[in-house]
């Protein structure tokens, strides 16, 4: 089993561990059917001679696919590729978060705050506050379903 480390923001680490490792801290095994797995496989490269040891807060397990890239040789992500992976994880988290809150609010009748708290508990996210996620959801909701300003006519029936 070959592993490598990447640096991502703390709340994204918590999301990844909650999604793929059931909240257990340890090497992260991304399923091969995931888009994130394909992205990581496409971005992994040979370790340069000048590269130091891996540093980061997320340890990824690199699986051996039958074609091309042997993980014993291809086991390094440059800083630019780490940023691309971080952006992809952030996009995945936000999409799942918005879908989760919409589903729980409209289908199960939960309030937005309760649905957000449930999302945080399910994925073990503690480095973000609920207010941050509430504000993010409000921005998303206003962008997707903007409110129309209602114009009232003044009525002088007296």
Pin down the residues of each PLM region.
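Long, low-complexity interaction regions most often at the N-terminus
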Residues: 1-78
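Positively charged, polyanion-binding regions of nucleic-acid-associated proteins
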Residues: 86-108
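Short, charged amphipathic recognition helices of the HTH superfamily
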Residues: 102-123
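Short, basic interhelical loop/turn and adjoining N-cap
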Residues: 118-134
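Short, basic alpha-helical nucleic acid-contact segments in DNA-binding proteins
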Residues: 136-151
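Intrinsically disordered, low-complexity basic tails/linkers immediately adjacent to helix-turn-helix/homeobox/MYB/SANT
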Residues: 150-158
């Amino acid at each position: 089993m070959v592993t490598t480390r990447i640096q991502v923001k703390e709340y994204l680490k918590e999301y990844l561990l909650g999604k793929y490792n059931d909240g257990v801290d340890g090497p992260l095994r991304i399923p091969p059917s995931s888009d994130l797995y394909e992205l990581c496989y496409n971005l992994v490269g040979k370790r340069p001679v000048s590269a130091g040891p891996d540093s980061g807060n997320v340890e990824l397990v690199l699986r051996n696919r039958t074609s091309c890239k042997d993980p014993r040789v291809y086991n390094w992500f440059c800083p630019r590729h780490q940023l691309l992976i971080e952006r992809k994880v952030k996009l995945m988290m936000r999409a799942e978060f918005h879908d989760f809150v919409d589903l729980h609010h409209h289908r199960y009748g939960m309030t937005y705050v309760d649905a957000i708290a449930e999302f945080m508990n399910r994925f073990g996210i503690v480095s973000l506050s609920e207010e941050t996620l509430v504000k993010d959801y409000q921005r998303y909701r206003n962008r997707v379903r903007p409110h129309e300003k209602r114009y009232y006519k003044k009525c002088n029936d007296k």
